[in-house]
A protein has these predicted regions:
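Zinc-dependent deaminase catalytic domain
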Residues: 1-165
């Protein structure tokens, strides 16, 4: 399934084994009905630079999770800091792709939450576009600086909304 997604998005993938990505994805399911998956790709070459799945952090009493977009950005930044990747790979910017995949392999709505949107805005000099899946499996694309949080109905994640319940 991951190979199909990567090829349909025309992502060049020389760094990661699709079977390993798929294993990470399905290991993340646990008791969840779906998993969010985020890819970070080079705007210039469309090369896959980083990816991540959401996961429960288990550190807090409420059900907080590490969001895939946030984690994929952190992985990319860590690679740059530790010099495991050269800055020239992202000089022309990156695109963030967010997908939600159900246990039945359906692609559903994966609009980034408010927290992830704010994190991306703090890195707007690096991020060119944000792409996400809608409930029909289509990919929606916006330049980060042109995203309208009111029009797109970007809101807090369920973990933030349910924090004190």
């Amino acid at each position: 399934m991951i190979e199909t997604i990567i090829s349909s998005l025309a992502i060049r993938n020389h760094r990661f084994n699709p079977a390993a990505i798929e294993r990470d994805l399905f290991d993340s399911f646990g008791s969840q009905r779906y998993v969010h998956l985020a890819f970070i790709v080079s705007s210039k070459t469309n090369e896959l630079l980083s990816y991540s799945c959401n996961c429960k952090d288990g550190l807090l009493p409420y059900k907080r999770s590490l969001h895939a977009e946030d984690q994929a950005l952190s992985i990319l930044i860590n690679k740059l800091v530790k010099k495991k990747m050269e800055f020239k790979n992202i000089r022309s910017g990156i695109n963030v792709i967010s997908l939600r995949i159900t246990r039945n392999n359906e692609i559903k709505l994966a609009l980034p939450c408010m927290r992830c949107y704010k994190r991306m805005m703090r890195n707007k000099n690096l991020i060119n576009s944000v792409l996400w899946s809608d409930d029909d499996g289509n990919i929606i694309s916006y330049k980060l600086t042109e995203m309208d949080i009111e029009k797109l109905k970007i809101r807090d994640s369920s973990g933030v909304r349910n924090r004190y319940q």
